[in-house]
């Protein structure tokens, strides 16, 4: 009698464990408030805030806009001039960054990881070693145009433009991610400098800065200290004596950490020659060779991951130690395309299968290019919101909601942003100059379902279902299913013929 009872209890425990495991796997994002995605109209958005720094420009979109609130994200575009340094900072939300132009280096500061890049011991002119503290730091990573870079929440990072042209980078912050346990406001915490709040309108910034300045000066006055302009980094609010004790330095050096009277902003110009950090030096040929080797290693590691999944071996979701984590994948290289149609264009994707850290961040991305007059067939995103940033050119875009209403029917141009909510259907058609975009998606493995073409939902339906659903002859149903042999990207009919048909109507 006891055995059946024990068996029942054991089975119940297994079911509970499996249920909890499923919740843990699918719990990457916080729930939306009711009605947050009840959007009757979408707009192509321009940046609403612009901040000029010493060596660059920061432009952001209003994170309180209904479209971005629906997707649960914030977006900022940073332009870093040659020899410009984006100061070290971390965010309350995980970030995906797309490098739209330029190249440079970045450092990501994982806590507890060793300083694997170190300076060699130098010798004096007499050939004898001098006693000095060698510089050591964590790994330096190169980036170039077309790269997607992942930054986990709370992990500090910096970027430097070591090229001859500006770096333009699009940062998406997933504020609805469970890694963010603050509110839904995007927050950047700077380790240096006196930066402005990228997401706050200039008038509000000036008021808040003035209020904090008064409070800080009042506190200094109570301690009999000389009044100074308040900095805006994480060290600014501490007493200089505490910092001096923590770093074992004098008080004057500690005050320099607080960046008082520093008006350079969050992107500063490196003085003199280029930033001197410890990193391997490559020629262009060596760098291209190393990038080819890296792509080969990524393909091999992807093959190994597939084999391990088929073999039933469990993994940690990252496949690497934290300290050697891959953070970058290039999706701008045409040879990297996942979908390619010779006359229409190409699409590349990055997800947790080819960049495992995205399983942690619960994000993915798509990079697309449509040639002149080409069409990205109507489709919907099954499991993610899509935030589309137009990189080059123009496209006609239509978006349809669950009521069959057109919520967007307009042109999307370079530099604009469009949010496409989950399950809303969308179609894109390039103008004469073509169209290129990057889409950030709020799922580690975002899935797309086409409405037309070889892999579409219509193609998958039986003819009899189409005949009865649309009240059409069987021949028309067959044409709907089989007239388009391409899967996703197709060559559109000429715009002139479309204009003629519209004129006839």
Swiss-Prot record:
Seed storage protein. It comes from Carya illinoinensis (Pecan). This is 11S globulin seed storage protein 1. GO terms for biological process: seed development; seed maturation. It comes from the Eukaryota. Gene3D superfamilies: Jelly Rolls. InterPro entries: 11S_seedstore_CS, 11S_seedstore_pln, Cupin_1, RmlC-like_jellyroll, RmlC_Cupin_sf, Seed_Storage-Functional. Belongs to the 11S seed storage protein (globulins) family. Expressed in seeds (at protein level). Expressed in seeds. PROSITE patterns: 11S_SEED_STORAGE. Residues 193-232, 282-318 are annotated as: Disordered. One of its GO terms (molecular function) is IgE binding. Residues 219-228, 282-316 have a biased composition (Basic and acidic residues).
